[in-house]
Amino acid sequence: LREDRRHIHDNDAIAIIQQSSLPINLECSINNDIIDIVCKLKPARATLVPENRNEVTTEGGLDVKGNYEKLQKVIDKLHENEIEVSLFIDPNEEIIELSSQLEVEFIELHTGTFANIYAMLHSNLAQTHHSIKELELSKNELKNRLNKSIKEIQTSSKLAKKLNLKVAAGHGLNYQNVKLISQIPEIEELNIGQSIIARSVFIGLSQAIIDMKELIKND
């Protein structure tokens, strides 16, 4: 739920929370008016995300350091309303330590950088007009960057667990790249939306979910 209501409107959030038998994790900005609405709706969890009016979708993690005092007030208010809190952050050790100090229950690691590198390396993205200019690199360089990105997510997940934070991951995850992230043992939740819905257009939502669940199994 954003200030610009780009993704969902208030009535969408109300309908989902009132009709779902499952606990709802509501992603929202840290704007005071939005937080007031979230406190009235009382989802099981609120995931705090950054909001940039010029972006189509969330492009990076929260600036926890720059918004520390603001986040503390928002988190306290959500906790007062018995709402669990998660912070959507980049895989960075300093940010994870700050998140722990803020006493949130969850962090969600931003996997967008990993997903972009993976797509430029393993798909035809580089040959299209959607190519990511800063990632138009040699295959060897992309492989090195992909390994570095995975390592950052692994290291961040381990630190978070050590600090008693629950770990989720999401952004850009799909049927091609998800296994590399789902194999990280500290990650207990994956937030995946667009790729499942896109696949469901062709095979139905039920089968799209079944296919994803098969991929993320770690037997």
Model segments located where?
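Alpha-helix-loop-beta-strand connector modules within alpha/beta enzyme cores
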Residues: 5-32, 66-86, 131-168, 212-219
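Hydrophobic faces of well-ordered beta-strands that scaffold small-molecule active sites
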Residues: 24-28, 46-48, 85-87, 107-109, ...
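Active-site beta->alpha loop and helix N-cap motifs at the rims of alpha/beta catalytic domains
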Residues: 29-65
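Catalytic cores of alpha/beta
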Residues: 32-41, 92-103, 169, 173-187
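Histidine/lysine/aspartate-rich catalytic loop segments that bind and position anionic ligands
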Residues: 90-150, 156-159
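C-terminal alpha-helical cap/extension of soluble enzyme domains
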Residues: 161, 167-219
